[in-house]
């Protein structure tokens, strides 16, 4: 266990990985004189080899510590081009709601979606479900990193939109934020969005306990395949405009099957293990 903790602590930061990629003799796509100017706030232009080094470094770091959201975000950006993020953008352009989102470019934060308002909505509404999930998991919409490594400004917004809508996907499916829940959701997202990072995240299943891994592949992966292949493109959901909609009705419209409650399953397993220990102690005494 101490070795694992040391490896997790050694996981590089995004800044360190980016600096390493720029300093490598194989990554000099741009010199200090010809590096393009940023195309939008926070944009960091990188060459092909620089993105390759950044992809490898962030992938290794995220595998060592699956809770490093910054590394996962970086991996998502540098592996989304040249094809996948454009495919997602084109899916939005082909949909009326998607086109409206691209025109409006809304952002999901605690200012644009105040939690007190969301908590005041009807109990089974989308907004109330989202707020309840945020409260239960102890997370905030303000923690999402800004996109940096996608060159096209419109595609950068598409990635930002996907990133900020991720918690809505959690809320609608009911999946929690611990690693097992994140992997189940990532498998669903991969089949819905085709963003490579979501599929690559499944490598983190090696970090699960055997029982968790067996449950992921036997119960939640089949759910992810069914819902991911049959559901509509979630990137085209204008969440801000359907906050009062019934969440069960939304799931039916989108073609999303609600998975078994992961927290309830884990709670029942813990209770069963506790009873078994108590029975063993009773026999031994």
Swiss-Prot record:
Residues annotated to bind Zn(2+): 166-167, 170, 182
Protein name (Swiss-Prot/TrEMBL): Ubiquinone biosynthesis protein coq4, mitochondrial
SS bond list: none
Catalysed transformations (reactions): a 4-hydroxy-3-methoxy-5-(all-trans-polyprenyl)benzoate + H(+) = a 2-methoxy-6-(all-trans-polyprenyl)phenol + CO2
Natural source organism: Emericella nidulans (strain FGSC A4 / ATCC 38163 / CBS 112.46 / NRRL 194 / M139)
UniProt KW keywords: Lyase, Membrane, Metal-binding, Mitochondrion, Mitochondrion inner membrane, Transit peptide, Ubiquinone biosynthesis, Zinc
Primary location class: mitochondrion
Pfam families: Coq4
Record's keyword annotation contains Cell inner membrane: no
EC number: 4.1.1.130
Oligomeric and partner information: Component of a multi-subunit COQ enzyme complex, composed of at least coq3, coq4, coq5, coq6, coq7 and coq9.
This protein's pathway: Cofactor biosynthesis; ubiquinone biosynthesis
């Amino acid at each position: 266990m101490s070795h694992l903790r040391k490896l997790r602590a050694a996981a590089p930061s995004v800044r360190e990985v980016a600096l390493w990629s720029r300093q490598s003799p194989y990554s000099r796509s741009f010199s200090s004189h010809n590096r393009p100017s940023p195309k939008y706030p926070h944009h960091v232009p990188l060459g092909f080899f620089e993105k390759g080094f950044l992809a490898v470094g962030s992938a290794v770091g995220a595998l060592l510590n699956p809770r490093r959201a910054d590394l996962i975000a970086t991996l998502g950006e540098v592996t989304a081009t040249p094809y996948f993020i454009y495919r997602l953008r084109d899916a939005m352009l082909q949909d009326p709601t998607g086109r409206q989102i691209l025109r409006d470019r809304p952002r999901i934060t605690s200012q644009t979606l105040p939690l007190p308002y969301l908590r005041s909505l009807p109990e089974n509404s989308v907004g109330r479900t989202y707020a309840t999930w945020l409260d239960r998991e102890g997370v905030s919409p303000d923690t999402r990193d800004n996109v940096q490594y996608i060159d096209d400004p419109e595609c950068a917004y598409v990635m930002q939109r996907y990133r900020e809508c991720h918690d809505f996907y959690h809320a609608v499916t009911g999946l929690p934020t611990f690693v097992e829940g994140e992997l189940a959701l990532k498998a669903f997202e991969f089949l819905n969005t085709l963003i490579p990072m979501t599929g690559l995240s499944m490598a983190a299943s090696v970090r699960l306990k055997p029982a968790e891994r067996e449950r992921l592949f036997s119960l939640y992966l089949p759910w992810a395949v069914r819902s991911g292949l049959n559901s509509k493109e979630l990137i085209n959901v204008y969440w801000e405009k359907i906050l009062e909609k019934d969440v069960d009705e939304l799931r039916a419209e989108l073609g999303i099957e609600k998975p078994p409650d992961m927290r309830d399953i884990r709670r029942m397993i813990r209770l069963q293990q506790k009873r078994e220990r108590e029975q063993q102690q009773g026999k031994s005494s």
